[in-house]
A protein has these predicted regions:
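Residue-level signal for inorganic ion chemistry
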Residues: 33, 80, 109, 123, ...
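P-loop (Walker A) phosphate-binding loop of NTP-binding proteins
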Residues: 9
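N-terminal phosphate/diphosphate-binding loop that engages ATP/GTP or pyrophosphate donors
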Residues: 23-89
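ATP-dependent NMP and nucleoside kinases share a basic, alpha-helical "lid"
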Residues: 84-161
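Conserved lysine of the Walker
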Residues: 14
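Hydrophobic positions on the alpha1 helix immediately C-terminal to the Walker A/P-loop
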Residues: 17
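Small-molecule kinase domains that catalyze NTP-dependent phosphoryl transfer to phosphate-bearing small molecules
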Residues: 68, 113-119, 130-132, 136, ...
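Hydrophobic anchor at the beta1->P-loop junction of P-loop NTPases
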Residues: 6
């Protein structure tokens, strides 16, 4: 099996770029952020503070997270319920950052992620794929873009969906998320030593996909 580990900050386009590249390569795309978001959604639904590590840990035995692959893409199932459309809100995003800093949560999901890579050729994206989850991946990418460019892209996404967005507020959220992700004690966001740095601040979406596909084909 061939594994591609893609790490990088929130809003750099990891998921959309990896998904398109996986389709072109015939690989399975694994959005690990969606897995953590599913945990965070359950925590919020239970009225638990996502920063309260013991309380979050107590919920884990009662959570069943499954990934289902359909022609439309990866679906997230939480205790049998399809929650794919419920995990992208700002509230869930901030709760995800807190939950993912809890060692017990990361340990809970680690084997699920590794099992997917053992059984499939995968493009897996997240925050610590190349450093922790798949340290032996054949290719590691650190995909990033400037906070300002990531905020602009998010505003454009929301506008396309017919939603108003405050650029300055989104930029602050991104900067706060970057700080939390890079300063947490457990698996902080950082490039693996042997990762290829891919800054797509000035790339179109298609250019990012083509660059990623090219890197994979060079290594295979």
């Amino acid at each position: 099996m061939f594994a591609v580990a893609i790490d990088g900050p929130a809003g750099a386009g990891k998921s959309s770029v990896a998904k398109a590249a996986a389709k072109e390569l015939g690989f399975v795309y694994v959005d690990t952020g969606a897995i953590y978001r599913t945990i965070a959604l359950h925590v919020l639904r239970q009225g638990v503070d996502p920063h309260d590590a013991p309380a979050v840990e107590a919920l884990l035995p009662h959570i069943q997270v499954e990934l289902a692959y359909t022609p439309e893409g990866q679906k997230m199932l939480l205790n049998g319920e399809d929650v794919t459309g419920l995990i992208r809100t700002p509230e869930v995003s901030m709760a995800t950052s807190a939950c993912s800093a809890i060692p017990a949560v990361r340990a809970f999901l680690l084997e699920l992620q590794r099992d997917l890579a053992r059984k499939n050729n995968v493009l897996m994206d997240g925050r610590d794929i190349g450093t922790v989850v798949l340290p032996d991946a054949q290719l590691k990418i650190f995909l990033t873009a400037s906070p300002e460019e990531r905020a602009r892209r998010r505003v454009a996404q929301l506008a396309e969906a017919g939603q108003q967005a405050d650029y300055e507020a989104i930029l602050r959220d991104i900067q706060q998320r970057d700080y939390q992700d890079s300063h947490r004690e457990t698996a902080p966001l950082r490039p693996a030593e042997d990762a290829v740095l891919l800054d797509n601040s000035d790339f179109t979406f298609q250019q990012s996909v083509e660059r990623l596909v090219g890197l994979v084909r060079e290594r295979m």
